[in-house]
């Protein structure tokens, strides 16, 4: 019995009629396409038997090339040879230039601050470059399968934010592909290993690719893939190993000029070749820009040790989130070409206390998992019992009065998910409400991340608390968030889809979670104070309206007592003494009880005026 059933309209296959589906691993350094044939998932090679497609595009005035041919032009035409474009997806130009100052491209900003790459083919954005890579993969699949693809599953890093995921979807549409689903890369690896090896229990998926690192802690049980926790860094990967080694070679060779893009590309190519060679050898000779020398594995290990340690810190945080100790992990799945580095395997093995799994090619495992999922979603396995449960990394909620955050969906909730919560108006006659969508674990707005704002207008002008607004948060299977606010009596509604201009890094997410724990007691006190201040404001607002309407019901002495109580409440509400505010609210309530009773009696008399007892 399936917990999560995903189907696409019009894609249910007729008996004995298989639809053509593919899984695509759109990687930072390399990309792959895979499919299921004769019940087996396999990656599809090019004419020369190469399964990997370098994620590189070379642009010229009269066209472009993708893959190996493009990569061969990198040293001679650096500015027009775009690689690692995945790192730019969904980011602002300022963010890219701050994070990756070494990129040898000519950038220009679009009107909204997004990056445009100045090439011989004109100004291109990362979505267009990604689309050209996807087109090449789709063409390989169509030729190999002798037909057009009915749908694809494309993998993305677990920490891609909404803008990055939407950019990936846009690239696929630009490439003419029907996206069945975006799938987190670690989850795709879990699918591949779960089906092939049949393991049950807790599994860690350590995914170190060219440009991103993801760690996922999953529980596999009877076909259920449940992500217990995720962590990682969307700006850490094998590319960083390459750049550290390239800088080291530059120092050894005494190359001071950093402005020559050709030399920079040669250094990077030499570093990549050395890194690969050092996975098997203890020493490698390097010849670059007229310099010859040796690099040892020990030197390389010293360079990358701090980066590997960063990945293990993320592993520790993910295990803590999942409530799992390292010794509870049955298997560790290695994903991504960078996991071939001996130091990575050694340190990961030491951390988890077991030898990592490498049975499936770490370069291919994500594409294979995506192909298996695509085969199911396209309708070729309608009776599949496989379940797939992802989680959101940080809580989602709304700002409420007093600068408080009301969490609607807690972090590590499985997705897709929809949650609704009712809110009401604060003031009499309020006809609009500002919806401020927040992300984070703290209690106050100032300590959380703002995702989006929108307004609900057309609320009927009722007394405070009279209108009821239902706010619904919906996170789909791709991790995209939509928020809808609807006033119940009129049906008027407004909504927004959250598309941040750039995403959170691993360190920012970890910091937000850590701060929520460190400041837990302080946050609770701050929330209690804010709630009391909001209640004080509500009481004073209500009292002001009542006095304006019915002050004639009070004697001068009674009015003075109420005014004194209200003034005292207004004064203490400016301070930080929660108990004092609470007592002042109680005092106002005590002083106004008789006034409230008289107002109620007056309302009843007015309602009954002109009616007989029988009519009542």
UniProtKB/Swiss-Prot annotation:
According to the UniProt entry, its GO molecular function terms are: ATP binding; ATP hydrolysis activity; ATP-dependent protein folding chaperone; unfolded protein binding
Keywords recorded for this protein, A-Z:
ATP-binding, Chaperone, Nucleotide-binding
Q: Which Pfam families match?
A: HSP70 (PF00012)
| Highest taxon listed in the record's lineage | Bacteria
> What GO biological process, any one, is recorded here?
iron-sulfur cluster assembly
Q: Which residues cross the membrane?
A: none
Supply the InterPro entries for this chain.
ATPase_NBD, Heat_shock_70_CS, HscA_NBD, HSP70_C_sf, HSP70_peptide-bd_sf, Hsp_70_fam, ISC_FeS_clus_asmbl_HscA
Which PANTHER family does the annotation name? HEAT SHOCK PROTEIN 70KDA
Recorded family membership: Belongs to the heat shock protein 70 family.
Purpose = Chaperone involved in the maturation of iron-sulfur cluster-containing proteins. Has a low intrinsic ATPase activity which is markedly stimulated by HscB. Involved in the maturation of IscU.
The protein's name is: Chaperone protein HscA
Q: Which organism is it from?
A: Salmonella heidelberg (strain SL476)
